[in-house]
Regions:
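C-terminal motif of bacterial Sec signal peptides marking the signal peptidase cleavage site
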Residues: 19-23
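Ligand-binding pocket segment of bilobal, Venus flytrap-like solute-binding proteins
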Residues: 184-249
């Protein structure tokens, strides 16, 4: 019995020793695997609908540069949709590392949710504005010539524009309409009357600029599509020769920001690569891709190179001219604000 007990004891000790060695070996393998994983990172880019074409060109170039510079591989998950919808998705838990949205107020909402640190604008060149554009009029009939915003109402045209509750592009359209009155000397009351008349002739409110384009082009609705100039240029490059014009008397500067989502990059361990990607977007190489996709580049050298494809606007006003995003949001787009009052009258 004593021999048997000793035998069992020796066997148990051997098992424990082997188990301990296996455990040590397992930990070492995990550590090595973790090291390999750290060399392969993933970024989630959340952007608004009409930027897809540009980012599909830019991202592979950044991936190549990052590999050459660091020896590390980075892959991207990409999400595109209406800027307002994308903003809500990030606030509600979509773990974006980088957001590139249609307007600064959307980034500010993510900041207010505690996901982006204050003063994010100072973290990238050009106050974090990565592209610019203006509003364009796309007309169904070639003989319909439009030079000014006022003609939309004067000619009683059916207008297609997206819903500013979900689409950043639609907010720019709304502000372009409003500012065309107030920036030319009109009163807020006159601006509201003008905008009301336009929206009386808006048959449907798609959720984003891309869907608005589909309503106009594919479904054949409307006389005029209000759209980003960059979308119109891109469509022309793809062979869609729909006539369009840019109102050059007054127009709004559509300034689109980009930002790192601080809480998510810290959680994912991707801050370094996320910040590098944001900075890459301001390089001439990336800015040329934005220009090729119809955006007005913020790099001055690239802007001069592509100047011929953009009409000069005589009076280019900004959101700041309308009081800034906080005032604009409260006055126009909050629940019960001017936009809701206008659509309630339809």
């Amino acid at each position: 019995m004593i021999r048997a007990e000793k035998g069992w004891a020796l066997w148990a000790i051997a098992v424990l020793l082997l188990g301990g060695l296996s455990a040590c070996g397992g930990n070492q393998e995990t550590a090595q695997t973790g090291g390999k994983e750290s060399e392969n990172q993933k970024l989630t880019l959340v952007s608004y609908a009409v930027t897809r074409n540009a980012y599909e060109k830019i991202i592979p170039k950044f991936v190549k540069q990052w590999q050459e510079k660091t020896g590390k591989t980075v892959t991207f998950d990409q999400s595109y949709g209406g800027s307002g919808s994308q903003t809500r998705a990030v606030v509600d838990g979509l773990e974006a590392d980088v957001v590139a949205l249609a307007l600064s107020s959307d980034v500010q909402k993510i900041e207010k949710a505690g996901l982006i640190e204050p003063k994010w604008e100072a973290e990238a060149p050009n106050n974090s504005i990565v592209t610019k554009s203006v509003v364009a009029f796309v007309t169904r009939k070639p003989d319909l010539k439009l030079a000014q915003w006022s003609e939309l109402a004067e000619k009683n045209l059916k207008v297609i524009t997206a819903n500013p509750k979900t689409s950043g592009g639609a907010r720019w359209n709304f502000l372009g309409l409003w500012g065309s009155v107030t920036q030319s000397g009109g009163t807020p009351a006159q601006a509201q009357a003008f905008v009301e008349k336009i929206y009386q002739n808006v048959p449907v409110l798609p959720k984003d600029a891309r869907e608005a384009s589909d309503v106009f082009y594919k479904q054949g609705q409307g006389d005029v599509l209000l759209n980003y100039e960059n979308e119109v240029i891109l469509a022309k490059q793809k062979g869609e020769n729909q006539p369009y014009s840019v109102p050059t008397d007054y127009n709004i500067s559509i300034d689109a920001p980009v930002a790192v989502v601080d809480s998510n990059v810290d959680k994912h361990g991707t801050r370094e690569v996320a910040e590098a990607f944001v900075k890459f977007l301001f390089t001439p190489e990336a800015q040329k891709d934005f220009a090729e996709s119809g955006f007005r580049p913020v790099d001055q050298t690239v802007a001069k190179e592509y100047a011929s494809q953009y009409p000069t606007v005589k009076h280019l006003f900004t959101v700041q001219d309308l009081g800034g995003w906080e005032k604009v949001q409260t006055e126009f787009f909050d629940d019960g604000a001017i936009f809701d009052k206008i659509t309630a009258k339809k």
